[in-house]
């Protein structure tokens, strides 16, 4: 199931539908979230959507959701290398930390995204960045038995 997000237009439309179908009801507006269209585009690997969104809202490149994840975290989690390239070209912070201190390299290593790990390392991601529990990307790759990622991280000086 896809994660819901509310754009201002969609929110206005849903409110209008509720008003029409529920005359006299007490309306509670939808809970606003920090999850925006750019996060959905990154999650889906929608390069066209990312490009269009960033052309209109360049500051959104490092916009965080409720969990502190940037669009780059989400692209890395889902192995969307082309989306990550767009985000990095537009100034995404390669070592941004989400809640818990995880970086895009952490989530790519945990997911076993070999091409993403290679891209992030080539672009300068810190191979030994530690999360709030002291874990490194190599710790995550080892825990999740991502053997190819383990080899790549070790070749780049990764430590546990």
Predicted regions: what is each one?
Residues 40-45, 74-80, 107-113, 140-146:
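Ankyrin repeat A-helix N-terminal signature
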